[in-house]
Amino acid sequence: MRVVLQRSKKASVTVDGEIVGQIPFGLTLLVGITHEDTEKDATYIAEKIANLRIFEDESGKMNHSVLDVEGQVLSISQFTLYGDCRKGRRPNFMDAAKPDYAERLYDFFNEEVRKQGLHVETGKFGAMMDVSLINDGPVTLIVESK
């Protein structure tokens, strides 16, 4: 499992002109799932993200988690995170999980994030989405389970 995490001042996701998910501040997650991922990977990433200290304390050090600052999570599925661009001019997406498996694991992942005590908004799995955010910092990290 691969997640691109962005600390966000605000974020929203729109499908067909309608906002389907939005947060006032917290983390925006782009979530990629490969065919080898399991529920164990999803749980590991959910716990890691909830407790990752990437929000600043009073002295400006990254010392607080999204839980500590009472932020929220906007989670967006993104199979293109497993695009292999090493050969040719078109990405190869063979490492991305098949949609039915990926959707089940993506839903499980979001529930695991919720179990950590976070409010989670989502996009629409498999849809073309417009994602808007103000990246705070900018702070952008890649979190992987393997």
Swiss-Prot record:
E.C. code: 3.1.1.96
Keyword Zinc-finger: no
Location in or out of the cell: Cytoplasm
A GO CC term assigned to this protein in UniProt: cytoplasm
Single GO term (MF): D-tyrosyl-tRNA(Tyr) deacylase activity
Catalytic class of the enzyme: hydrolase
Main location: cytoplasm
Gene Ontology process terms (BP): D-amino acid catabolic process; tRNA metabolic process
Motif position, Gly-cisPro motif, important for rejection of L-amino acids: 137-138
Catalytic activity: glycyl-tRNA(Ala) + H2O = tRNA(Ala) + glycine + H(+); a D-aminoacyl-tRNA + H2O = a tRNA + a D-alpha-amino acid + H(+)
Keywords: Cytoplasm, Hydrolase, RNA-binding, tRNA-binding
Sequence intervals crossing the membrane: none
Annotated Pfam families: Tyr_Deacylase
Top-level taxon: Bacteria
Protein family per UniProt: Belongs to the DTD family.
HAMAP family associated with the record: Deacylase_Dtd
Domain notes: A Gly-cisPro motif from one monomer fits into the active site of the other monomer to allow specific chiral rejection of L-amino acids.
PANTHER family in alphabetical order: D-AMINOACYL-TRNA DEACYLASE 1, D-TYROSYL-TRNA TYR DEACYLASE
Function recorded in the entry: An aminoacyl-tRNA editing enzyme that deacylates mischarged D-aminoacyl-tRNAs. Also deacylates mischarged glycyl-tRNA(Ala), protecting cells against glycine mischarging by AlaRS. Acts via tRNA-based rather than protein-based catalysis; rejects L-amino acids rather than detecting D-amino acids in the active site. By recycling D-aminoacyl-tRNA to D-amino acids and free tRNA molecules, this enzyme counteracts the toxicity associated with the formation of D-aminoacyl-tRNA entities in vivo and helps enforce protein L-homochirality.
Protein name per its UniProtKB record: D-aminoacyl-tRNA deacylase
